[in-house]
């Protein structure tokens, strides 16, 4: 292999076309043995060329006889795999005008022919002149002719002509020369073909490659990277043209990491002490500081002991070390607050990304044991990742020893097996007043007194001596307040006026003094009427007991009535469902009306009427793209006669089906075949006369709408989403006008093509869903399966499916689209969904959903089905929004719909998360995990400090994802501020 490669290097500069000779008469040492017809025509003789070399030639000179037709046939020539053949002919021709008394039939040209065959079929005895279908190559004319024969004077003029022919497909061929009245000598014939030579180019080896069948043909030659080189981008290839010359290469190889180019044709190993990290690098580089490469061909230099390289450091950067500890710590104690200041470390490890962590430890009086501080301790600006040499610490306990470790860390501290270098400072806090009392409760009230209680301050900072209560009438101000004291955390305030509202505050006292007053809270004394009613409180108790008994009896009666009505509704629902199948409806003039295929006595007749039968030979199945209820779904191609080939989706009926399953399967085609609308999936036809039975529809490249939106979360504008909704509404308007009720309208049943056009699909299958109890989407109801989250309440309760119930489902689809495929009602159970809807709760607006769109959703979710908009009205409303984008700028909020109770999805308890990974998983943004960790946001404490600029800096550019993450960070901050046990 190495020897072959060296040979290629020697040939690399010789890139001219190669010619491989198949026959050359100049090298013949004996008779050529060609066949002449007639025998008096061509004659083989020995002669001399212009250099007086002996050669075998053929000559003919019957110019004085008319009607000459002299043929000369070569022996069989093997083509050796060549597709195009070149013939070089050297000949002399006598000038007809130099011949005395020559008739007018004298010629100065001859014809060249060839005949392609797989074997030797012509001999001197059988030349098949009359049978052979010779193919003419060209008429050969002399550029120069001679008039005298004088070899001594060198007056003979030799012509050289080259002709090519092809394509050739047989094993070989014959050449034939036809003379029809010339005086000429055929001095030599060379037959050859061309090929592009082996070459090394762009660090790739290309083999010898034969030219194509035509002079304009380009033959692709695949290249192989030379040793220690690898392809870049597209596979490397060269084109060999018809002249045996290489064209401009496509793709390239480059030396792989650890190897550098040598004279553009070889890759040599980087010597020890050098490296090359990537293919793109030009050559080897010396190892950066504090690193080495003891062996050849190193793609990276390893760091010396005690030095490291951060994950985000490129190989070209010097290895660095961890910093030394901070210096010269100064502490300032103010009661239960501390300010720490320090100088940067003497040694930064060669890096400029030094930050500081503060480790707080609360100790016993003798400092023999310490424990981590609780989460109530506050650090400003933060505890971890400090960039400045100063921190303010508050909310400490009074009279308490603390130890603070100030760690210096940099980008490689996590690589070191040793803990970060730090400096410790021991501090004891001073005495301090107690913290604020968090809240007060009213225990009881009379006309002239109020009894209150409250919890102890979270930080008493010593023994509580007593409490001071300040109170005043709300109509006055605190300058007219009165004071009371209590030795315990309860107090009764007397001497108040009846029916008045009082503002009350409380504070605790220790030996260090009073703490701050609590927040203002209002309490009211009883009025005279309130007091009298309390005296009569026994009477309501008796009345309440009696009322409870009455309610119990009424409840029993009501349950009996409801059960009777449900049975009645059940019967009505069954009959109304059947009646709908036979309803003709009243459509617009000239509008087709949907015909239920199950009204046919023979359902196969409906298939024949509404679906076109396709010959299975026109269908080509390529790959599985899903599985349906009845069998697998494939992507394939359909080529009908006289039409272009198109991609299609192919639903198949699985083997072993019953006749009922076949009928149910084909009913969808009978339904779909009646529709013709740009927002309804188009039926191409069915295959019923072979197995498997197929339904063939147009192919939608982006698949189901719900999964498509989840894959592209936040990547579409509001106008684009409204455009999708408008298309779905237009398709449903068409179905409603045909009196067709879909029953299973959901984003999963909307398909999206490559132009983002949405089309309604999945017709008729909702009636025949299998009893798969593992699928929570569909729930049993009155003997059938219903997609509860998408279904109108009257359809759930009474199976009353109408276009109005489809409008309800369309409202849910709107919510799915605006939330980018979120599951309606989240993780609520189906029964909880039914209960919430019965109590008039509705879904809240998705994040950043325009108020106008959410209002349209609420209109679709009207309990009274007659109050819901029709699909024609929905289309008009969406058209107005598209024409007036400003109407979509107002974002909906839950508080903006006071008349309509909305469900509120609970925010996750972020304080329960311990890692950034857990948090990202909870908000479904786990794809950014590496971005957070690489940028140094390794704890939730650091994450809570992030801004929109930080998100951009770590590579989160999608506006929707930024908003989702920032909203979560905001919620996390709120929870941390409200939780006494939030993360540090």
UniProtKB/Swiss-Prot annotation:
Chain residues that bind ATP: 625-633, 651
Enzyme Commission code: 2.7.10.1
Modification after translation: Phosphorylated. Autophosphorylation is stimulated by the ligand EFNB1. Required for interaction with SH2 domain-containing interactors, for activation of the MAPK/ERK and JUN signaling cascades and for ubiquitination by CBL. Ubiquitinated; (EFNB1)ligand-induced poly- and/or multi-ubiquitination by CBL is regulated by SRC and leads to lysosomal degradation.
Annotated glycosylation sites: 334, 426, 480
Catalysed reactions, semicolon-separated: L-tyrosyl-[protein] + ATP = O-phospho-L-tyrosyl-[protein] + ADP + H(+)
List of residues that carry Phosphotyrosine: 600, 928
Fibronectin type-III domain ranges (all copies): 322-432, 433-528
Active site: 744
One Pfam assignment: Ephrin_lbd
GO molecular function, one term: protein-containing complex binding
Protein name, UniProt field: Ephrin type-B receptor 1
């Amino acid at each position: 292999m190495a020897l072959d490669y060296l040979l290629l290097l020697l040939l690399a500069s010789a890139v001219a076309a190669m010619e491989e000779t198949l026959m050359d008469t100049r090298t013949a040492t004996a008779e050529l043995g060609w066949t002449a017809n007639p025998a008096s025509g061509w004659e083989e003789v020995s002669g001399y060329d212009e250099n007086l070399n002996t050669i075998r030639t053929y000559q003919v000179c019957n110019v004085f006889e008319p009607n000459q037709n002299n043929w000369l046939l070569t022996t069989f020539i093997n083509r050796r795999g060549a597709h195009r053949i070149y013939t070089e002919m050297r000949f002399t021709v006598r000038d007809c005008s130099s011949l005395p008394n020559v008739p007018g039939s004298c010629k100065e040209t001859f014809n060249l022919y060839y005949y392609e065959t797989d074997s030797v079929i012509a001999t001197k005895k059988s030349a098949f002149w009359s049978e052979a279908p010779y193919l003419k190559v060209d008429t050969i004319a002399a550029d120069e002719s001679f008039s005298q024969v004088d070899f001594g004077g060198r007056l003979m003029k030799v012509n050289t002509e080259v002709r090519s022919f092809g394509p050739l497909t047989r094993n070989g061929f014959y050449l034939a020369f036809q003379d029809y009245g010339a005086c000429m000598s055929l001095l030599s014939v060379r037959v050859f073909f061309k090929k592009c030579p082996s070459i090394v180019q762009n660090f790739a080896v290309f083999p010898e490659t034969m030219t194509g069948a035509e002079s304009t043909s380009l033959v692709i030659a695949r290249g192989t990277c030379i040793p220690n080189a690898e392809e870049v981008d597209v596979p490397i290839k060269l084109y060999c043209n018809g002249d045996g010359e290489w064209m401009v290469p496509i793709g390239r190889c480059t030396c792989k990491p650890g190897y550098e180019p040598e004279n553009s044709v070889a890759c040599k190993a980087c010597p020890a002490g050098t490296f090359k990290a990537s293919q793109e690098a030009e050559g080897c580089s010396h190892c950066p500081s504090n690193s080495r490469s003891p062996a050849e061909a190193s793609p990276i230099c390893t760091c010396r002991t005690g030095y490291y390289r951060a994950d985000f450091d490129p190989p070209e950067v010097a290895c660095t070390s961890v910093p030394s500890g901070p210096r010269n710590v100064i502490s300032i104690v103010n009661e239960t607050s501390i300010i720490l200041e320090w100088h940067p470390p003497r040694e930064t490890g060669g890096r400029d990304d030094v930050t500081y962590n503060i480790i707080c430890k609360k100790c016993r009086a003798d400092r023999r044991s310490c424990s981590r501080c609780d989460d109530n301790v506050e650090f400003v600006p933060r505890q971890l990742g400090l960039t400045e040499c100063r921190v303010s610490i508050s909310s400490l306990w009074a009279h308490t020893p603390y130890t603070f470790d100030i760690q210096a860390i940099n980008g490689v501290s996590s690589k070191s097996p040793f803990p970060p270098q730090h400096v410790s400072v021991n501090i004891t806090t001073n005495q301090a007043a107690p913290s604020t009392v968090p809240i007060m409760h009213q225990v009881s009230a009379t006309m002239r007194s109020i009894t209150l209680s409250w919890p102890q301050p979270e930080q008493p900072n010593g023994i509580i001596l007593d409490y001071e209560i300040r109170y005043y009438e709300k109509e006055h101000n605190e300058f007219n307040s009165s004071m009371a004291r209590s030795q315990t955390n309860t107090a009764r305030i007397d001497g108040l006026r009846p029916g008045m509202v009082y503002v009350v505050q409380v504070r605790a006292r220790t030996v260090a003094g009073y703490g701050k007053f609590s927040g203002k809270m209002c309490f009211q004394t009883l009025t005279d009427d309130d007091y009298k009613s309390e005296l009569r409180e026994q009477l309501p108790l008796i009345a309440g007991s009696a009322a409870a008994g009455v309610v119990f009896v009424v409840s029993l009666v009501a349950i009996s009535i409801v059960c009777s009505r449900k049975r009645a509704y059940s019967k009505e629902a069954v009959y109304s469902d059947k009646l709908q199948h036979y309803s003709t409806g009243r459509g617009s003039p000239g509008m087709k009306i949907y015909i239920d295929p199950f009204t046919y006595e023979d359902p196969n007749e409906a298939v024949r009427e509404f679906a076109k039968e396709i010959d299975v030979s026109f269908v080509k199945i390529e790959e599985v793209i899903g599985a349906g209820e009845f069998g697998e779904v494939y992507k394939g191609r359909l080529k009908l006669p006289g039409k272009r080939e198109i991609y299609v989706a192919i639903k198949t009926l699985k083997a072993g089906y019953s006749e009922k399953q076949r009928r149910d399967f084909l009913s969808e085609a009978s339904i779909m075949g009646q529709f013709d609308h740009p927002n309804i999936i188009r039926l191409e036809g069915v295959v019923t006369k072979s197995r498997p039975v197929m339904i063939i529809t147009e192919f939608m490249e982006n698949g189901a709408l719900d999964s498509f939106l989840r894959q592209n979360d936040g990547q579409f504008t509001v106008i684009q989403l409204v455009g999708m909704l408008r298309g779905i509404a237009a398709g449903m308007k068409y179905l409603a006008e045909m009196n067709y009720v879909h029953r299973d309208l959901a984003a999963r049943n909307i398909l999206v093509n490559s132009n983002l056009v949405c089309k309604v699909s999945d017709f008729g299958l909702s009636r025949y869903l299998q009893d798969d109890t593992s699928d929570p989407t569909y729930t049993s109801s009155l003997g059938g399966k219903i997609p509860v989250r998408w279904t109108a309440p009257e359809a759930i309760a009474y199976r009353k499916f109408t276009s109005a119930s489809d409008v309800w489902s369309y409202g849910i689809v709107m919510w799915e689209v605006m939330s980018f495929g979120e599951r309606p009602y989240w993780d609520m159970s189906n029964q909880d969904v039914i209960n919430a809807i019965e109590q008039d709760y509705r879904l809240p607006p998705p994040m950043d959903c325009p108020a106008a769109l959410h209002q349209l959703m609420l209109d679709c979710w009207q309990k009274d089905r007659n109050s819901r908009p029709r699909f024609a009205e929905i289309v008009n409303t969406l058209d107005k929004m598209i024409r007036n984008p400003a109407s979509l700028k107002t974002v909906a909020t839950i508080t903006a719909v006071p008349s309509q109770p909305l469900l509120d999805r609970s925010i996750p308890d972020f304080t329960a998360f311990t890692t950034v990974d857990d948090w990202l998983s909870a908000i479904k943004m786990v794809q950014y995990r590496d971005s957070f960790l690489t940028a140094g946001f390794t704890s939730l404490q650091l994450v809570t400090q992030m801004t929109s600029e930080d998100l951009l800096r770590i590579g989160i550019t999608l506006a929707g994802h930024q908003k989702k993450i920032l909203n979560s960070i905001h919620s996390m901050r709120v929870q941390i501020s409200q939780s006494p046990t939030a993360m540090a």
